[in-house]
Regions:
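Conserved catalytic-core segment of NTP-binding enzymes
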Residues: 1-88, 98
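A general structural signal for short secondary-structure boundary/capping elements
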Residues: 26, 98-105, 133-137
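Broad hydrophobic/π-residue packing in well-ordered secondary structure
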Residues: 77, 95-96, 128, 134
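Cell-surface, membrane-associated systems
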Residues: 89-93
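C-terminal boundary of histidine-terminating zinc-finger modules
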Residues: 100-122
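C-terminal alpha-helix
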Residues: 126-142
Length: 144
C-alpha cells in the first residue's frame, strides 16, 4: 500500500499530473505519477501483487471554496485515469501542529496525561478512524 498525502493545492497536484490553467483538464502525468507507474510495472514483471495506491487530501480548510471543489474534481478525475483510490484526509488542525514537533500523534494524548479531549481533538480522532477504515488493511481496525 502506497499512501500519498496531498495538500489541497494545485501546486502540490502538479506532482501528480499537469493540468490546464482553469484547473479542469488533465494534460498528462507528472513526475510522481510516472514514478508510481514505473514501480507498478516492475512489480508486475516480478510477478508481485499490484500496488494499492491511495491519495489522501491533507490540511483541508473548513470553508467551502471554489479551489477546494476544483481540487476534489481534479483528484477524482485523475484517480480514474491513472488508477489510485482516494481516502478521507485530515482537516487543518492546531493539534497536529502541536504534536508533530514533539514526535507525538493523536493516539499519544492519553500517554501524555490528556484526560479529556476537546471537540476538535475528537473530530481529529474520527478523521484518523475514517482513514484507517478506508485503507482496508488486512487485520487492522481503528479500535481507539
Amino acid at each position: 500500500t502506497l499512501i500519498t498525502p496531498l495538500n489541497d493545492s494545485f501546486i502540490d497536484f502538479d506532482l501528480l499530473a499537469h493540468i490546464d490553467a482553469n484547473g479542469e483538464k488533465i494534460t498528462g502525468p507528472s513526475v510522481y505519477s510516472e514514478m508510481v507507474w514505473n514501480a507498478r510495472q516492475l512489480r508486475a514483471q516480478a510477478g508481485l501483487s499490484a500496488i494499492d495506491w491511495i491519495v489522501v487530501r491533507n490540511r483541508l480548510g473548513a470553508q467551502r471554496m471554489v479551489n477546494k471543489e476544483k481540487m476534489e474534481r481534479a483528484i477524482n478525475n485523475l484517480s480514474k485515469r491513472i488508477g489510485f483510490r482516494t481516502a478521507p484526509g485530515f482537516n487543518e488542525r492546531v493539534i497536529f501542529r502541536e504534536l508533530f514537533p514533539r514526535g507525538l500523534t493523536l493516539l499519544d494524548l492519553k500517554d501524555i496525561g490528556v484526560k479529556q479531549l476537546n471537540i476538535s481533538n475528537i473530530a481529529a480522532r474520527q478523521e484518523l478512524r475514517d482513514l484507517i477504515k478506508a485503507l482496508e488493511l488486512p487485520g487492522v481496525s481503528p479500535d481507539f
